[in-house]
Amino acid sequence: MIGQWNNGTGRRKSSVARVFLKKGSGKITINGKDIQSYFGRETSIMIARQPLALTNHVETFDIRINVYGGGESGQAGAARHGITRALIDYDAALKPALSQAGFVTRDAREVERKKVGLHSARRAKQFSKR
């Protein structure tokens, strides 16, 4: 399996995606389901496919993705990051174009923790003058 598959691990928020790609017809499977049935929103599907569209490999690879943690948006971002890394593993010449588009860099933004004495991470209790 390792010989014919290229792999990459992508992360976004609290989601982690392990991506495996090989030459094929363009079928993307996430956790055993087709990408159309796994992601409800068209934007999530578009986000996950961005690196393939940029490098003109939309119908070149069959992709298998195992993703866990987080929500739909985070999982789509993790899948995009993983596909990017797998494409670089396949052909290092694609890295400059993917890097220029900002797909290689891991988006380090995480949810800020809630602090004691506040409603949320930054929202303070309502001030009462009297």
Swiss-Prot record:
One of its GO terms (cellular component) is cytosolic small ribosomal subunit. PROSITE patterns: RIBOSOMAL_S9. SUPFAM superfamilies: Ribosomal protein S5 domain 2-like (SSF54211). It comes from the Bacteria. GO terms for molecular function: RNA binding; structural constituent of ribosome. One of its GO terms (biological process) is translation. InterPro entries: Ribosomal_Su5_D2-typ_SF, Ribosomal_uS9, Ribosomal_uS9_bac/plastid, Ribosomal_uS9_CS, Ribsml_uS5_D2-typ_fold_subgr. Disulfide bonds: none annotated. The keyword Hydrolase does not apply. Keywords: Ribonucleoprotein, Ribosomal protein. Belongs to the universal ribosomal protein uS9 family. This is Small ribosomal subunit protein uS9. It comes from Verminephrobacter eiseniae (strain EF01-2). The lineage of its organism: Bacteria, Pseudomonadati, Pseudomonadota, Betaproteobacteria, Burkholderiales.
